[in-house]
């Protein structure tokens, strides 16, 4: 009866992730979820919290159990696709707290000074 919650949009250290697409753009994504599930055989679900129209009520939405693939790369791809689905339930509420695309060899778009 125990649970672990992982913020799957965090950017890992280079050794802790795989390059995967997120909204069509390559990024380094954590492999921790796949590694934990592969080791423990735990059930995996996504969860999203949607703020209600008045701003003082919230709805938690859990996905059906996710089938985790046999390889790390496929597991990371599955996690990113599921995260995209969660975000698209209310994209205006998603807070881009992490610089998701900074470690994938993409042009660096963060911390540029605006004149």
Predicted regions span which residues?
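Non-catalytic C-terminal accessory region of glycerolipid acyltransferases
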Residues: 1-115
């Amino acid at each position: 009866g125990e649970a672990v919650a992982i913020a799957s949009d965090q950017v890992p250290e280079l050794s802790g992730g795989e390059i995967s697409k997120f909204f069509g753009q390559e990024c380094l994504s954590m492999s921790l979820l796949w590694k934990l599930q592969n080791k423990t055989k735990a059930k995996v679900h996504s969860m999203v919290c949607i703020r209600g129209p008045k701003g003082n009520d919230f709805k938690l939405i859990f996905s059906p159990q996710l089938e985790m693939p046999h390889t790390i790369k496929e597991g990371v791809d599955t996690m990113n696709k599921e995260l995209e689905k969660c975000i698209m339930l209310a994209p205006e509420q998603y807070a881009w707290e992490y610089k998701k695309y900074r470690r994938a060899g993409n042009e660096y778009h963060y911390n540029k000074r605006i004149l």
